[in-house]
């Protein structure tokens, strides 16, 4: 397993509400946890150096939760059907940098139409319209990181 993959896993763990993550690739495995356990050690020698700082920012995780709670009252202002991110990842409006965007504001969409891509761990996940309607707003900029359940679009 490549150290870059381990670093990406740590970043995803920090960005999400997950407390522990274990990945197995063939005979190799790595376990990353927000809470240190002396019995469970990652296979990689470098991994503990990266896993230890993850436990330290745990109190800081309360601050984004408080910020999310403060911004929660703004959520009811969204009109129509709100399409939310099903995962933590990176938001892309098009299949590639040279491709046209999947949708634009004011465009009509049908249930099942692809609205965007959320990339998570090098996997491109198509996000589809849950209802038919018109794109009222696009709430995220292309290439920006998104959180689980973050609003991406409104469809009216």
Curated annotation (Swiss-Prot):
GO terms for molecular function: acetyl-CoA carboxylase activity. The keyword Lipid biosynthesis applies. The modification N6-biotinyllysine is found at residue 122. Pathway: Lipid metabolism; fatty acid biosynthesis. This is Biotin carboxyl carrier protein of acetyl-CoA carboxylase. The gene is accB. One of its GO terms (cellular component) is acetyl-CoA carboxylase complex. The keyword Lipid metabolism applies. Residues 80-156 form the Biotinyl-binding domain.
């Amino acid at each position: 397993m490549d150290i870059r993959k381990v670093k990406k896993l740590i970043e995803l763990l920090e960005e999400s509400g997950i407390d522990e993550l274990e990945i197995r690739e063939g005979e190799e495995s790595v376990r990353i946890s927000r809470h240190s356990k002396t019995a469970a050690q990652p296979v990689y020698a470098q991994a503990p150096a990266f896993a230890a700082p993850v436990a330290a920012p745990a109190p800081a995780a309360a601050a984004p939760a408080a910020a999310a709670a403060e911004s929660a009252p703004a959520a009811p202002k969204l009109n129509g059907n709100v399409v939310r991110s099903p995962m933590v990842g990176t938001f892309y409006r098009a299949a590639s940098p040279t491709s046209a965007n999947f949708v634009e504001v004011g465009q009509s969409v049908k249930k099942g139409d692809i609205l965007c891509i959320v990339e998570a761990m090098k996997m491109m996940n198509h996000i589809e319209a849950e209802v038919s309607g018109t794109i009222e707003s696009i709430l995220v900029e292309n290439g920006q990181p998104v959180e689980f359940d973050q609003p991406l679009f409104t469809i009216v």
